[in-house]
Amino acid sequence: MASFPPSLVFTVRRNEPTLVLPSKSTPRELKQLSDIDDQEGLRFQVPVIMFYKRKLSMEGEDPVKVIREALAEALVFYYPFAGRLIEGPNRKLMVDCTSEGVLFIEADADIEVNQLIGDTIDPGFSYLDELLHDVPGSEGILGCPLLLIQVTRFRCGGWAFAIRLNHTMSDAPGLVQLLTTIAEFARGAEGAPSVPPVWQREFLAARQPPSITFQHHEYEQVINTTTDDNKSMTHKSFFFGPKEIRAIRSHFPPHYRSVSSTFDVLTACLWRCRTCALGLDPPKTVRISCAANGRGKHDLHVPRGYYGNVFAFPAVVSRAGMISTSSLEYTVEEVKKAKARMTGEYLRSVADLMVTKGRPLYTVAGNYIVSDTTRVGFDAIDFGWGKPVYGGPARAFPLISFYARFKNNRGEDGTVVLICLPEAAMKRFQDELKKMTEEHVDGPFEYKLIKVMSKL
């Protein structure tokens, strides 16, 4: 477990934002989003960032020019991203495919990649506003660009690719599909993308008549009595390598250590530490919501190339006192229950709930949402400069933590977790986490690797 040194000071020179349009004419039409896409809980912008080191074979190539031209080519196939969202009857979202383009910013910074990526990543990317400028008037959901991209060159020859996505358009795998297409064109590919994009958002439209077949704890409308001010929130990132995961597993009885995935163990640990840090009353209802990918579910049959949202975040309910004081096995089993709820039928039940209940926001009170992006593919996007030294979400949110794949300076592969908590709770969280990751209950042990699919 490690945290980043104090924020660096550096200067970024940005050109005026421009709009990148598809390189060829595209259809002018209206396209409805699915009833999973346009739920209230996805009507926000999510930032992703990738850092690339200098590559000798790419000397003389300007990443700004390469990305801008590849983006224009990709938008021919992903032309809805060049449009704007409008709202129809009953708040139904639609893309007006206007070919207005996506926002693009060219920038230079007097800093090096290695100064930004240390033993872990900067907590909350305190410099994110420098590498992904919030263009005034672009932050809305309706009538605004659906993508904002900034390419920043560093003095070392490395560079950063930062993108802000209107989450109603795509989930993480959908965004990776778009980025992969941009990367293919950046490396000189011609013709169509290797995976042709599929719109077909009616695939996840509500059924007629709607039929809510599950109890959805993640959408229960509960009065939030918490008074934390989001302005007092602080961000930190934590690295979990083999040593840290072994330490967490050592808190389980020997017979239990090999039967749970790293995701299950890590999520249970974080949920417990977070619950303790927030000082919640023991009887208070708490939830864990695990973002779960519907792709690959035998009862869903998602079309190959579909880039809309295909995930839900099924939740289980417990009490703060149970999570804080019960055995860690109990917490792991609760996490497993949440994951097990995700099926194709569950996702269709969510779509039906959205149109029946008026697209409710996910539960805020006592909820903790975790999203595992370690196997989504952000860390494999190659624009010609090789794989990024970091690729993944750029910021946590008060209720949401993201997991991303990361290799620290010692060459250890692991998971970096972005955490956002009130300032007063963050210190307690770190203290609780230290107990879990640095105190061994007994000696070393062996466990078999449990493979799990990404949950976003």
UniProtKB/Swiss-Prot annotation:
Biological classification of the source: Eukaryota, Viridiplantae, Streptophyta, Embryophyta, Tracheophyta
Organism: Actinidia chinensis var. chinensis (Chinese soft-hair kiwi)
Catalytic activity line of the entry: 3-(methylsulfanyl)propanoyl-CoA + butan-1-ol = butyl 3-(methylsulfanyl)propanoate + CoA; ethanol + benzoyl-CoA = ethyl benzoate + CoA; butan-1-ol + benzoyl-CoA = butyl benzoate + CoA; 2-(methylsulfanyl)acetyl-CoA + butan-1-ol = butyl 2-(methylsulfanyl)acetate + CoA
Protein keywords: Acyltransferase, Transferase
Protein family membership: Belongs to the plant acyltransferase family.
Enzyme Commission identifier(s): 2.3.1.-
BP-aspect Gene Ontology terms: alcohol metabolic process; fruit ripening, climacteric; response to ethylene
Pfam families for this protein: Transferase
Active site: H167, D382
UniProt keyword Iron, yes or no: no
GO terms of molecular function: acyltransferase activity
Name of the gene: AT16
Function: Involved in the biosynthesis of volatile esters which confer kiwifruit flavor. Alcohol acyl transferase that can use a wide range of alcohols as substrate to produce esters. Exhibits benzoyl-CoA:alcohol O-acyltransferase activity.
Tissues in which the UniProt entry reports expression: Expressed in fruit.
Keyword Acyltransferase: yes
InterPro entries (UniProt xref): CAT-like_dom_sf, Plant_acyltransferase
Record's protein name: Alcohol acyltransferase 16
Gene3D superfamilies (alphabetical): Chloramphenicol acetyltransferase-like domain (3.30.559.10)
